[in-house]
Amino acid sequence: MTPDCILLVQGLSKHFGGVKAVTGIDLEVHTGETLAIIGPNGAGKTTFYNLLSGRLVPSSGSIQFKDHDITGLPPHVISRLGISRSFQLNNIFTEMTVRENVEVAVTAQRRESWRWANRAAANKAVQQDADALLAELSLAHLSDRVAGTISYGDKRLVEIAMVLATRPELVLLDEPTAGMTPDETGRIIELVRTLARTGHYTFLVTEHDMRVVFDLADRILVMHHGSRLILDAPEVVRADPEVRRAYLGDEAADMMEPA
């Protein structure tokens, strides 16, 4: 494990009976980088994320996060060690306000209990942390809105605010721009770029939009049938004929061309 390695995956596999969802993945993630994970549907990307975040236990292999062996640990333990993730579908409390959603995440990070009865007298530090995150993500003007009434793009931003509220060092974003308008997609791209520039976060990003991938990624991991096909710089992946023809298709290959 090199000094700048934050996540080391060795021989990671997950089989469901005879189905090999993930097979023998080796990966070293560097502190501060944004690494994109791409591949066709069924390539094993979601299963891989579920293994990293503790939602699934590996069939074999190991996962090391900094100095910790996190192989098979439950999600709440992995989160407290510094790994947090978003989901492809919004995972927020739609009947609560935007601020309350973030306060719940801040409270969980502090290992305290959320109590509706004490909402008016909530811990001031929790409120301050939540308000700071909402301001950072340009959501302050929506703080008192019920989360279920805001736009889809803003809901995605609220979920990212909740992810950041856990104070992670490694952030797993699962298709963060799925279903978004071009303007909303642009907001997410700029947000991830801004957060990456702070040096506080390392990002793994799964994404089907190749323009988003090439806008954000320092390196790209291509998965196919649960295995690692290639891991390299964007320009190398962009030029790889096997990736272009066999795993992205003609339309996606066109999207990989420089603008």
Per-range role (PLM):
Residues 2-259:
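Glycine-rich phosphate-binding loops of nucleotide-dependent enzymes
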